[in-house]
Amino acid sequence: MSKEKKYRIGTYLILIPAILFLFPKVYAQHESKTINDSWKFYQGECKAAASATYDDSAWNSIHLPHTWNTDAYTEKKYYQGTGWYRRTLTLPKNWQTKQVFLKLDAASKAAAIYMNGRKIGEHNGGYTACTFDITPFCSFDAPNSLAIHVDNARQDIPPISADFTFFGGIYRDVWLTAVPKQHFHLTNYGSEGIFISTPQVSEEKGTILIRGEIKNDAEQKASLELEHIIYNPDGSIAQTQKQSIQIKGGELYSFRTETSPILSPRLWAPEAPHLYRVESILRDKKTKAILDHSNHHTGFRWFSFDGKTGFSLNGKPYKLRGICRHQDQKPIGVALTDEMHRRDMKLMKEMGANFIRISHYPQDDALLEMCDKLGMLAWEEIPIIDIVPDTPGYAENCENNLREMIRQHYNHPSIITWGYMNEILLVTQRRYKKEEELKPVLERTLSLANRLEKVLKEEDSTRVSTMAFHGSNSYNEVGLGNITDIVGWNLYQGWYGGDLTGFERFLTEQHKKHPSHPMIVSEYGAGSDKRLHSLQPHAFDFSIEYQQKYLEHYLPILEETPYICGGTHWNFIDFSSALRDESMPRINNKGLVYSDRSPKDVYYYYKAAWRQDIPVLHIASRDWTHRSGVQHGKAPVPLPVKVYTNLPEVELFIDGKSLGKQKTENYTVTFQVPFSRKKHFIFAQAENKESDQSISMIEDALHINFTPIPANLNETNLRNLELAVNVGSNCFY
């Protein structure tokens, strides 16, 4: 159950307690709460920690979400190992007659759970949830000891190699849930046991398919009634479905119901994300007491991918304007609050994105809920990256993680594709040079890909499958290119090698060779460091200006090439990658926003390109507030000042003097500005024609300090001149 849905139930309890007293059996007996507070934590191994009587008073007191890897922002060899979490649970007396479940939204990479010294179970996978029935292990007469052992060093669980930090810990919520003996199947791969799809969708009509499982944990049979209420986006009831169920003691009962057609459905799209709500109510047939209760949103939409015409949504061509997103933030790592996840989604939507690659792993439910509500199409994947190892249990863990991801997030209408491999030949080809060594690894990789493709289609035939390849034709040569429905290409021409025009050459070549293959540019990007600026930016200098140049080249190609379904920029944020030793060690700084989520200049370039509904005007290289240049005599020094905008023309002023107007090209305008004194005031304005009768002025301003460097240095002018030299780089620092 989503966090928001639980909050709604809780609010209902507070607002109308009188109704509960009058009709105590009518309200749902499904109780759920987080247990994020009052934990004890120990980093390392402790053999006795699972014991109910173990004294953990010397351990650190923490609250969830939590990670032990804040060291990854400073240490290349960050801690990868084990940790223990413990806390005491006192369970309500009235839970004695119920089934009690423990859910971990995520613990990286592996977790083993103990209650009162007894092992409940374990979970392999650091990015998907797991749920355990803990009823047989609980005490209702005395406090319970809960201990969780977490390990982020396991080599049989994906990922084992990647360009991001494998943060360890219980970094999402932990939940306790109590339900009557008859309830929805809560241990179904960490899902809620209810799956909703829209098998028939058009502008004229649509149907909703609701399927799932009910568990009877009592010994005796039960007569039940299952009701599904479909609510329109405006909250009115569209339809109701009821069925009677006879379920034996200990039985798991499967149900499947399709609604009659809903006429002229409100379609879900990024511009208008209309959501229908499906309320599922399980009752005792005789007493009408509500036993279990669930709410899920769904949306009517259909889509297609085509190798020639690209992507279509609801029958119309639609360009996927996307972003990839990692989930950490310096200095707290991946221990983000729900509101932090929501904030990121709002920032993306504000920029004009309509698509997110949730990479390289499943992320928090709060993020998926925002995708549905804000209108953000989504690609979600499991983290099989770089290489497939010959490790016992690895393939099984990959399969389980894929099933978990699909079942846990199946009901989100925003999701259009599931993925399961990223750049899987990158490390493979580097590590194995000899044919006899490479061949078995390729066979193992192909075998796993085919296995996962089969699982994906069994789990969900309504969405498409995808893999992301690095810029090498070897994927097609070994047969990986023919397995999934669509292919994503991670392309960095002009950054890691080659020149910028290699980007369009590669895409053209792939399209000629495989014209029927739908294609997404699943990664592209260039790093930037706010301390580095350049008048002659070039690849891998990490200057703010080269990131601008790079993206100004890539984005028009993505927008204007019809057979490209779209692209997802790598990455939305500057994220933790502990192995990196670049201008900002331990950070991959390709983000459109900094780690603290303050926007970079290129954020506004995208906003200007993607938001045609609002005016955008932004003076670029905004972090470059102290500039310098070589001055001949007393003549002003001309330096470029760039403005990002979606308005037709821009007028620029320096210290109140107009430098004229210039036409906008590729959402940019660049002026040569005469700098001469220590401090200048730069002011940009543009007319925004709101209607034939209404024109408003859009403005932006920036103070720039300028240091002139005399063309001829001598004893006199050197006395008051601080001359800094950035050795090995042409960047200003």
Question: Model features per residue range: what roles?
Answer:
Residues 182-217, 607-647, 709-718:
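Surface beta-strand/loop "capping" patches
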Residues 43, 61-73, 118, 153, ...:
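Extended substrate-binding grooves/exosites of carbohydrate-active enzymes
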Residues 33-35, 45, 75-76, 80-187, ...:
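Accessory beta-strand-rich segments of carbohydrate-active enzymes
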Residues 1-30:
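Bacterial Sec-dependent N-terminal signal peptides
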Residues 82, 141-143, 205, 248-252, ...:
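Solvent-exposed, conformationally flexible loop/turn segments
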Residues 138-141, 211-306:
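Extended acidic/polar, glycine-enriched regions
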